[in-house]
Amino acid sequence: MMISRACLSALAALTVPYPATADGDAPESRVVVAVAHPDDELFMAPAIAALAREGHRVTIVHATPGDAGPGVSDFPKGEALAAVRRGEALCSGTALGAAEVVNLGFGDGKLAGHVRDGSLAKALAPHVTGAATVLTWGPDGGYGHADHRLVSAITTQIVQARTAGERPALLYVGIAAGTLPPVAEMADWAVTDPALLTQTIAYTPADLAAAKAAALCHVTQFPEASRQGMMGLFDATMWRGKVHFHPAF
């Protein structure tokens, strides 16, 4: 996704009220962020930073290293790009305060081949075990990306099989209808009825700054103007001081 400099400049004057504290689970609970690619965590980045700041142990799990790109770098598809993106993921996770960043190593764009044999579920399930909360894409995958949808579906499959005493809260990140950033690149992103987005994680200016630092890590995926302005754009439009989630159950 690329965001034009003009759109970023147009939104620069917007101001956003920030809640004093972030909403989270009990201190020191485990939170797992299950997504498909390095950079997917950006769409809930200040929420991750808020949870980590409050003392939750956050693990970010990427199903693939993003070896297919395409991004904005000169790297061809393959292991060289994957290696750089793993480093970008670690940089981003560190900026957000995550305790652990894990890559499951499946091929970018090839997750469908690991659903029927159960290998994706088997690889992801141990990371979900013991978590109090799991954050992931909604069924829409943000903008319909097949890998995003599959990670959401497999994560849901894992969580719904757990008994009540072992089942973590499962939250789908969502964009409330009417709050999409006014950029052409996001015109086709899925939105959710605000009435369903009943869980929010509020963040502070420091958490947003951490999110901005995380975005700067993903050099292969976004031009500099987008990396510099993406979090501010999201803050001014679809977040406004808190990231919105739809409880799965």
Where are these regions (language model features)?
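Functionally engaged cysteine thiol sites
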Residues: C7, P70, H148
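Bacterial N-terminal signal peptides
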Residues: A6-T15
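Metal-dependent de-N-acetylase/amidase catalytic core
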Residues: Y18-A34, E54, V115-F249
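Positively charged n-region of N-terminal signal peptides that target proteins for export
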Residues: M1-R5
